[in-house]
């Protein structure tokens, strides 16, 4: 009897040490390995991994995304009559930590992984996700390499340079601006690509190859933008695309106000969804500003209303949800729909129908093995979920209508938020 007690105490001590030193992710691995009796309960749950930066320099964004996932989980906590269990991995905003964390998450066999914010920590996870054949959905990372190099990594937002098309549509079709200029920082490749799409779209819409009256670059080592601002004034531009990050944009706009260049509409990037920049713009009644976003309460679907109501109920009526939280809410629901669709597909297909989908004997055997596994466990495999995620069309999300159209890059409407006279005006939607 004493031996049994000593062994139990030893296990508990080791467990406490492991949990204290390495955190909950390692604890879950420890529990799965040494307490197999819990496997019955695990079969009644479907796991969704959260690979996010909840500490480190990206933690503000990471925490906002986790809020959206958890809120969706509170509203929709089951799928296929099974409880959805959220398992967490904090990459600490570090590619080195992220490499370990993603492997720990994968070892717990999640059906889908959500995250991360931050391009580097997302890219470092990509190869492991692909090797494990687990579909993942990045919520806010927009680097095209994430989805281009990995068919298992999906985006829940629009590709970065597409905002150039949307802003051109807004400027020309929505506001009648047919004489425009562009501004970017020197050596900013992403801004260069986005501006190229903007200018090409403007030329196509207007039918005028000379509608771009100025293309300006700002030196990274100088904060004096007087020369460029005066050049814009002389150009006669009616709208200016400022492909600048929030801090530089605020400095530029402040100087434009000081120099009384306020008769133009300033078009910004998605990154302008920034609290400090928004506070500044709203404090300047002479500024006329528009910028793209995945989310606006002024453009509402039934899911948007559900999301906002749930958010305010949990966090307070005076609290406003961020774009990141809305997209994360959608990413979780996209995962659930793909899981449900995948299992429905499995149950509808016969073994012969599965075999007929593949040409070689090896692929047929692998597909049939996964088909049998899903039927036995009641949980579809990663490949099956990935297949159905690709097929999602016209998904009604809090951040808009989302489709994948057989790919892993989201196609969705882009909302152009508009602030004039210090107040938010009616938003414009580009399909």
Each PLM stretch: what is its role?
Residues 1-11:
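Bacterial N-terminal signal peptides that target proteins for export
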Residues 13, 24-431:
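Extracytosolic ligand-binding ectodomains
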């Amino acid at each position: 009897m004493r031996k049994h007690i000593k062994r139990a105490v030893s296990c508990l001590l080791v467990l406490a040490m492991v949990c204290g030193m390495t955190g909950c992710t390692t604890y879950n691995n420890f529990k799965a390995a040494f307490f197999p009796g819990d496997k019955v309960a695990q079969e009644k749950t479907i796991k969704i991994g959260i690979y996010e930066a909840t500490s480190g320099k990206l933690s503000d964004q990471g925490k906002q995304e986790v809020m959206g996932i958890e809120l969706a989980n509170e509203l929709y906590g089951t799928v296929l009559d099974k409880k959805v269990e959220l398992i967490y991995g904090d990459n600490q905003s570090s590619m080195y930590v992220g490499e370990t964390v993603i492997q720990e998450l994968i070892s717990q066999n999640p059906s889908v992984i959500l995250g991360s914010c931050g391009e580097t920590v997302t890219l470092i996870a990509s190869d492991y996700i692909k090797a494990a054949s687990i579909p993942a959905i990045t919520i806010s990372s927009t680097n095209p390499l994430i989805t281009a190099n990995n068919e298992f990594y999906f985006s829940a937002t629009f590709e970065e340079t597409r905002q150039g098309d949307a802003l051109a549509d807004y400027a020309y079709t929505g506001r009648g601006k047919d004489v425009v200029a562009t501004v970017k920082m020197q050596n900013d490749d992403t801004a260069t690509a986005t501006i190229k799409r903007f200018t090409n779209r403007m030329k196509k819409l207007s039918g005028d190859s000379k509608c771009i009256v100025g293309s300006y670059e700002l030196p990274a080592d100088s904060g004096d933008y007087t020369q460029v601002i005066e050049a814009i004034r002389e150009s006669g531009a009616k709208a200016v695309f400022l492909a600048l990050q929030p801090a530089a944009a605020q400095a530029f706009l402040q100087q434009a106000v000081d120099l009384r260049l306020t008769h133009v509409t300033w078009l910004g990037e998605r990154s302008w969804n920034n609290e400090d920049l928004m506070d500044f713009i709203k404090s300047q009644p002479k500024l006329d500003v528009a910028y793209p976003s995945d989310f606006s309460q002024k453009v509402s679907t039934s899911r948007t209303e559900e999301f906002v109501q749930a958010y305010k109920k949990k966090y307070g009526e005076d609290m406003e949800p961020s774009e990141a939280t809305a997209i994360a809410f959608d990413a979780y629901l996209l995962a659930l729909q793909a899981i449900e669709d995948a299992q429905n597909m499995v149950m509808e297909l016969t073994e012969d129908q599965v075999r007929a989908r593949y040409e070689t004997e090896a692929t047929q055997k692998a597909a049939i093995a996964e088909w049998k596994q899903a039927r036995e466990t009641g949980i579809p495999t990663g490949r099956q979920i990935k297949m159905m995620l690709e097929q999602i069309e016209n998904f009604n999300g809090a951040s808009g209508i989302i489709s994948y159209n057989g790919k892993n890059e989201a196609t969705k409407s882009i909302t152009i938020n508009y602030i004039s006279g210090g107040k938010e005006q009616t938003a414009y939607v580009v399909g």
